[in-house]
Amino acid sequence: MHFHFSKMHGLGNDFMVVDCLTQNIFFSPDLIRRLADRHRGIGFDQLLVVEAPYDPETDFHYRIFNADGSEVEQCGNGARCFARFVRMKGLTNKTSISVSTKKGKMILKVEDDDQITVNMGEPVFEPNKIPFKATQAEKTYLLRVDDKTLFSGAVSMGNPHCVTVVDDVDAYDVDKYGQLVESHERFPERVNAGFMQIISPNEVKLRVYERGAGETQACGSGACGAVAVGIMQELLGEEVKVSLPGGDLHIVWQGPGKPLFMTGPATHVYDGQLSI
């Protein structure tokens, strides 16, 4: 099997992006794991696949696979790279691109300054839709993990997120507690674990342990989920700069009933071809 791909990243959250409109490729979980290997393969956090639209009202279908081979519902940084890829490869010349995902639809907008704004839809807090085991929706839940009780928020941005406010995110043991939260029994489909330090009502620092990938340089949907939880807990304003290890994202959310918007960069690194 021979195919072309692009390597891209959004603030260091890196992707292998493949056009499956003009190429016929089947990505098995084993193949994805081999390609994701940073020593023996291409190396990436997620594989992004461009497919023909499933819905006539959309331009493309957007599929996301983690480095462990599992398919997931959403990836915000990947969505920005997806938008840049389809324009760069001449698959569309639109500046407003509609895509379907495993769990919904998104609008991707290419801005004049070359940043990409993603309409992430409305954050979902109903426990059964996240999914999260709870009798009713709360702003804060108590999670017992190992030797700690975490005071956390839970939200879906098309994929599940658990957000915990901490005093010093740089010193926090994200690897230890990220793994424990990711596989916590109250999240039946596992969860992305975000740890957020509030600098001001309009600025936070965030580290995210991604489900199936570990800690990444940036997580777009994680930044969106963190801000949504912070706003619901009355800790943040409507516009927030989120500083991640890989760089900054700008998040805007006017509250329940409104869509959330994420703006940030998408970088093309190189193009390649593989024979498998």
Swiss-Prot record:
The record marks Y270 as: Important for dimerization. GO terms for biological process: lysine biosynthetic process via diaminopimelate. GO terms for molecular function: diaminopimelate epimerase activity. Its EC number is 5.1.1.7. It comes from the Bacteria. Keywords: Amino-acid biosynthesis, Cytoplasm, Isomerase, Lysine biosynthesis. The record marks H161, E210 as: Could be important to modulate the pK values of the two catalytic cysteine residues. Substrate binds at N13, Q46, N66, G76, N77, N159, N192, E210, R211, G220, S221. The active site is at C75 (proton donor), C219 (proton acceptor). The keyword Cytoplasm applies. GO terms for cellular component: cytosol. Pfam families: DAP_epimerase. Signal peptide: none annotated. Its main location: cytoplasm. Pathway: Amino-acid biosynthesis; L-lysine biosynthesis via DAP pathway; DL-2,6-diaminopimelate from LL-2,6-diaminopimelate: step 1/1. It is found in: Cytoplasm. It catalyses: (2S,6S)-2,6-diaminopimelate = meso-2,6-diaminopimelate. PANTHER family: DIAMINOPIMELATE EPIMERASE, DIAMINOPIMELATE EPIMERASE, CHLOROPLASTIC. Belongs to the diaminopimelate epimerase family. Catalyzes the stereoinversion of LL-2,6-diaminopimelate (L,L-DAP) to meso-diaminopimelate (meso-DAP), a precursor of L-lysine and an essential component of the bacterial peptidoglycan. Homodimer. This is Diaminopimelate epimerase. The gene is dapF.
